[in-house]
């Protein structure tokens, strides 16, 4: 596997899940695979789980790890061609990428949506420049429109905790004080559509996700109705994706606190597990009561980020041989 940016790059999900559970039993089974190989992790944005879990995964495989925070200690980077660089940006990404690539074997990139131009975000301008100009295998540690490492960990978690063969999984929008990218909900939808689940998406009008991620999923605007009989509730906020309201791309259209996941919402489910990628705004996205309940999976879900990253890096290392 040379690139990892979406669910299709991973291939057959059943074999990927089997590999994940194999690694979960013995994280160091392939500890010599990455000997004398270097993984470069490039962060344009903040990170806790992705930063720690991906470093741990690389070391599980025997790799050396270099971490670069682009906005802390590195030269400011220009990303546009044709710009007269007479401002505060000292280096162009087109030189920086091949230089960084010369020091490593595999590159991970984390770069969020900017909400300035939908086309730039949805064509994954930054991530694709690394793919085009690095000459090295590249994986996404969250890009403008997707977070596949998170979605893979989510799928592992659902597979681990499901109580029936085809559970009902609900992705629900919930309020947040800031405008957040669609990367996590996009990827979650993309992966659930490939999994053997009954998948439902619920959100206020105007928050419709891009059809290429929604695909055949059921969209229910009545949140309580969507929750009925659910086995897993996955809560996440996202700003307007600009699908039905292009002029509102990246804007906050609602802060309806009635959509916060609370005990009343969970009461209509099938004793559902609660999931969230973290970090979470308590008592906006979800109440203390729900996130602290025995059915909350946010911690094991986060722990599975190490497993998803280990599987991905293992396959990328195997592709180098």
What is the role of each PLM region?
Residues 1-52, 56:
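Positively charged, low-complexity intrinsically disordered leader regions
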Residues 212-289, 295:
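Rossmann-like adenosine-cofactor binding region
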Residues 33-39, 166-168, 271:
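Phosphate-coordination loops involved in phosphoryl transfer and adenosine-cofactor binding
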Residues 292-321:
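C-terminal helix-to-coil terminal segments
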Residues 61, 133-134, 195, 215, ...:
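Short, structured coil segments at secondary-structure junctions
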Residues 44-62, 66-67, 159-236, 241-242:
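Glycine-rich phosphate/diphosphate-binding loop of Rossmann-like nucleotide-binding domains
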Residues 34-41, 47-159, 281:
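Phosphate/diphosphate ligand-binding glycine-rich loop within oxidoreductases
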């Amino acid at each position: 596997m040379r690139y990892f940016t979406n669910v299709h790059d991973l291939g057959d999900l059943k074999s990927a899940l089997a590999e994940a559970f194999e690694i979960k039993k013995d994280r160091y089974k392939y500890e010599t695979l990455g000997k004398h190989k270097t993984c470069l992790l490039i962060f344009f944005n903040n990170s806790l789980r992705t930063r720690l879990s991906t470093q741990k995964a690389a070391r599980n495989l025997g790799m050396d790890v270099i971490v670069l925070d682009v906005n802390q200690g590195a030269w400011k980077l220009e990303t546009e061609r044709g710009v007269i660089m007479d401002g505060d940006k000292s280096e162009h990404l087109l030189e920086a990428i091949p230089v960084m690539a010369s020091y490593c074997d595999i590159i991970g990139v984390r770069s969020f949506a900017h909400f300035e131009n939908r086309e730039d975000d949805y064509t994954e301008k930054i991530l694709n420049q690394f793919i085009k100009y690095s000459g090295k295998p590249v994986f996404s540690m969250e890009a403008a429109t997707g977070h596949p490492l998170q979605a893979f960990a989510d799928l592992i978690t659902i597979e681990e905790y499901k109580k029936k063969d085809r559970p009902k999984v609900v992705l629900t929008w919930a309020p947040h004080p800031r405008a957040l990218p669609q990367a996590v909900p996009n990827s979650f939808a993309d992966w659930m559509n490939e999994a053997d689940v009954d998948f439902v998406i619920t959100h206020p009008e105007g928050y419709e996700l891009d059809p290429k991620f929604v695909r055949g999923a059921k969209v229910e605007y009545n949140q309580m109705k969507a929750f009925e009989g659910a086995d897993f509730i996955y809560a996440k906020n996202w700003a307007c994706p600009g699908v039905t309201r292009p002029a509102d791309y990246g804007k906050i259209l609602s802060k309806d606190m009635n959509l916060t996941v609370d005990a009343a919402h969970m009461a209509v489910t099938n004793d559902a597990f609660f999931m969230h990628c973290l970090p979470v705004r308590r008592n906006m996205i979800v109440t203390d009561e729900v996130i602290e309940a025995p059915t909350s999976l946010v911690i094991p879900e986060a722990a599975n980020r190490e497993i998803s990253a280990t599987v991905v890096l293992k396959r990328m290392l195997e592709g180098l041989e």
